A protein has these predicted regions:
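Short, charged, amphipathic alpha-helical segments
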Residues: 150-159
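Non-catalytic all-alpha helical scaffold/repeat segments
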Residues: 1-113
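TPR-repeat structural position
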Residues: 63, 147-148
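Extended, low-complexity, charged alpha-helical tracts
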Residues: 135-145
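Short amphipathic alpha-helical heptad-repeat segments
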Residues: 124-136
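Short, charge/polar-rich alpha-helical segments
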Residues: 116-126
């Protein structure tokens, strides 16, 4: 036992249980805090919720993973009024917080949200090239106002889809030679 009478094993068990409950709760969220039925986000409510979650996570020593789960949740947001994803409130928040963990969560969620794709013979990476162009365009449009989001999130998405497009193009070329 420690000098203060507490048992480290009990404290570690409690921390693990708390973390598991937090991750379950974050993983179970299906709507972004502050989001109404139309998908419009009350930025003040979202910022307050995120700050409270990060502050609590910081106290419990699990900020990185909580930021990641918050990012996964934010990855569900709609396009903004300007047509750019993520919406204005989310991109402002992520730009301010500057968390690579949050970016990673958003990236994973956005990639996973695409689901299964199918293609006709000869398509190659045409689908992915269109996605690359979209993310590159959005990244250019946000480069001045939201450089972190533009580069770290939209640039990463464009790069990963570019890699996938090249893979499908290579596969198509191989099929044509068989």
């Amino acid at each position: 036992k420690r000098d203060d009478g507490k048992d480290d094993r009990d404290e570690n068990t409690n921390k693990k249980e708390f973390r598991a409950k937090c991750f379950d709760a974050l993983g179970a969220l299906s709507h972004i805090p502050g989001e109404d039925n139309s998908g419009k986000i009350n930025t003040e409510k979202l910022e307050e919720w995120v700050q409270q979650a990060i502050n609590l996570a910081e106290k419990k020593g699990c900020r990185n993973i909580v930021e990641y789960f918050i990012g996964k949740l934010l990855g569900h947001c709609q396009n903004g009024e300007d047509g750019i994803w993520p919406c204005e409130g989310v991109r402002d928040l992520v730009e301010d917080i500057h968390s690579k963990n949050m970016i990673e969560g958003m990236y994973i969620e956005k990639r996973n949200s695409r689901g299964v794709t199918s293609r006709s013979f000869g398509d190659g990476g045409a689908q992915e090239w269109r996605i690359v162009e979209q993310y590159q365009d959005w990244s250019r449009q946000l480069a001045i106002t939201h450089p972190f989001v533009a580069d770290e999130l939209l640039g990463w998405l464009a790069s990963s889809y570019k890699h996938e497009a090249e893979m499908w193009d290579d596969e198509h070329r191989l099929d044509m030679h068989l």
